[in-house]
Curated annotation (Swiss-Prot):
It comes from Vibrio vulnificus (strain YJ016). SUPFAM superfamilies: S-adenosyl-L-methionine-dependent methyltransferases. InterPro entries: DNA_methylase_N6_adenine_CS (IPR002052), SAM-dependent_MTases_sf (IPR029063), Small_mtfrase_dom (IPR007848), tRNA_Adenine-N(6)_MTase (IPR050210), tRNA_adenine-N6_MeTrfase (IPR022882). It is found in: Cytoplasm. This is tRNA1(Val) (adenine(37)-N6)-methyltransferase. Disulfide bonds: none annotated. Its main location: cytoplasm. Specifically methylates the adenine in position 37 of tRNA(1)(Val) (anticodon cmo5UAC). One of its GO terms (biological process) is methylation. One of its GO terms (cellular component) is cytoplasm. The keyword Transferase applies. It catalyses: adenosine(37) in tRNA1(Val) + S-adenosyl-L-methionine = N(6)-methyladenosine(37) in tRNA1(Val) + S-adenosyl-L-homocysteine + H(+). Belongs to the methyltransferase superfamily. tRNA (adenine-N(6)-)-methyltransferase family. Keywords: Cytoplasm, Methyltransferase, S-adenosyl-L-methionine, Transferase, tRNA processing.
Amino acid sequence: MKSGTLKTKGFKFKQFSIASSNSGMPVSTDGVLLGAWADFHHSQNLLDIGTGTGLLSLMCAQRYAHLSITAVDIDAHAMEAAQENFSHSPWHSRLHLQHGDVLKLNFTHRFDGIICNPPYFNSGEQAQATQRATARHTDTLAHDALLLRCRELLTPNGKANFVLPLTEGEQFLQLAQQQGWHLHRLCRVKPSPNKPVHRLLFELGLSTATTSEEHLTINDGSTYSAAFVKLCQDFYLKM
C-alpha cells in the first residue's frame, strides 16, 4: 500500500477510503449494495463503467484477489478522485483508469465481468450540480446504448451487474430482453419490512440461464437486518 493520506475528507471503509468531493458520485448505499452483491468469482478482467470515485472497483478488488480491473469515466473530476482513491489502496497495481466515453473508447480485449451503477434520471428534473447531473442523468449514457456497448465488450460467458431504482430497473430489464440478454440473478431490495421494493440488483448474461431470485431488506426496525450485515460487513466500519 502506498504511503500518505487522502487529500480530501471522505468515507472510510475497513480496507480503503473514498475521497469524493471532486466527483458527482458520493458514496451511496446503492453502490455498496452492488459492490457487495455482484459475483465475479469466475471472472478475470472486470470493466467498471462510470466508476465515479472508484467505489465499485475498490470493493471488487478487495473481494477478488485475482481480478484485473479497468475503470472508465467520462468526467475528469471523477477520474481525479478515482485516481487518488486507487493510489492509496492496497490493490493499486490491479486497478487501471481510462478517461473517456465508454461508447467510444477502444479496449485491447473484451471483459468477462462488467459492473455499473447506471444513470437513471431519464427526463425532467436535473440535478443542481453539473457533475451530479452527469453522474445521474441518462443524457450522458442512455440505457439502450449502454446495453449494446456491454454486448460488444462482454465475453460470451461473461456477466454484467447493475443496480437501479425499481421503475428504471424494470424498464432496463425490458430493454435487455429485447436485445437478447438473459437475466441470471435478481435481488429485490426494500429499505424496511413495511416498505415496498425500491431497488433492483441484477446480473445479466449473453448465455441462457435459470434466473435466481432473492429479496433483501436493509433495515429491521431500528437496526440493520442480519442479511444486510452479512452482505456488507466486510466493508462498513461499524459492522
